[in-house]
C-alpha cells in the first residue's frame, strides 16, 4: 500500500498486516500475533481502519434493502461495533509498542471520530488535494501523537482546481477502491520526516 511504498522509497523496513492486499502478514489483525516483535521494534505505526461502516453514507440505506435485509439502526450499530474491534486492536498494538509516532487515518466525516475511545485522541485534518494531483479534495482526519505538524487544508488554489471546483470527487465512478483508499506520498513523507 501507500505507506509501504514510501517506506521503501526512504529505504526503511516496513511490516504490513492486511487480509486482502499483499502484506508481510496477510491475516486478520484480530488474529495477528504482534508480540512476535520486540517492544522497541517499531518507530512508527500507521493504521487505516476500514471506513465503510463508519461512513455517513450508510445512513442513506436506513429503511432500505441492503444485503438482502432491511437496513436498520440496529444493523448499523452492530456493524460499527464490529469495526470498533479493529480500531481497538490497533490502539492495543500502539499502546504495546509505544512507538515514537503513531497514526490512525480515516475520512474526516467518518463516524469513527464520535466513538468514545477516539474522542480524546489528538488529530489533524488534512486535504489530500494539497499533497497530490489526484483531482479530488478528500478531507481526512489523522489521529496522531506527532506534535506541531503543519497540516494543509484546501485554499481553493490547489493544483486540483478547475475554476472553482476540484477536477473530480470520490463519488465519481471509475476510481478503484484501491485509488479511493490510497494516501498521498507527499503527506506520508511530511508526517514521517518533518
Feature map (PLM): residue ranges:
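Class I S-adenosyl-L-methionine
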Residues: 26, 32-42, 51-194
